[in-house]
Amino acid sequence: MRVLVQRVSSAAVRVDGRVVGAIRPDGQGLVAFVGVTHGDDLDKARRLAEKLWNLRVLAGEKSASDMHAPILVISQFTLYADTAKGRRPSWNAAAPGAVAQPLIAAFAAALRQLGAHVEAGVFGAHMQVELVNDGPVTVMLEG
């Protein structure tokens, strides 16, 4: 499982022109782009959620937990693109939707159980994601 994290001052995700998730924190929040690969499981999703919740990437070396910062979760299978051969990426390392969808939902649920305010995109949908990266700060978590 890979989670590409961006510290933001605001973010929104639209599907078919309609906002389906948005965060507008008083200070900073996080956008988590989540990719799932073969062999990922619920334990991995929970561990990465806890790592994200406690990751000290907000102002003053604070975590989302410290600041009660909101998190926008977006599924993104392209985090497992393989560009080693040719000019067209392979997606073979990305788990199929039937595996990935429940694990991304479990990741978001684990964040909520930890106390996070979580917004989310729509799994499998074509989404337009708008965000204002603050810093910029972008970190890759892998588990």
From Swiss-Prot:
Instruction: Give a GO molecular function annotation for the protein.
Output: tRNA binding
What would be one Pfam family of this protein?
Answer: Tyr_Deacylase
Reaction(s) catalysed (UniProt annotation): glycyl-tRNA(Ala) + H2O = tRNA(Ala) + glycine + H(+); a D-aminoacyl-tRNA + H2O = a tRNA + a D-alpha-amino acid + H(+)
Q: Where is this motif: Gly-cisPro motif, important for rejection of L-amino acids?
A: 135-136
Q: Which Gene3D superfamilies match?
A: D-tyrosyl-tRNA(Tyr) deacylase
EC number, as in UniProt: 3.1.1.96
Annotated compartments: Cytoplasm
Which BP terms from GO are recorded?
D-amino acid catabolic process
Question: What is this protein's function?
Answer: An aminoacyl-tRNA editing enzyme that deacylates mischarged D-aminoacyl-tRNAs. Also deacylates mischarged glycyl-tRNA(Ala), protecting cells against glycine mischarging by AlaRS. Acts via tRNA-based rather than protein-based catalysis; rejects L-amino acids rather than detecting D-amino acids in the active site. By recycling D-aminoacyl-tRNA to D-amino acids and free tRNA molecules, this enzyme counteracts the toxicity associated with the formation of D-aminoacyl-tRNA entities in vivo and helps enforce protein L-homochirality.
The record's domain comment reads: A Gly-cisPro motif from one monomer fits into the active site of the other monomer to allow specific chiral rejection of L-amino acids.
What is the name listed in the Swiss-Prot or TrEMBL entry for this protein?
D-aminoacyl-tRNA deacylase
Q: Which organism is it from?
A: Mycobacterium bovis (strain BCG / Pasteur 1173P2)
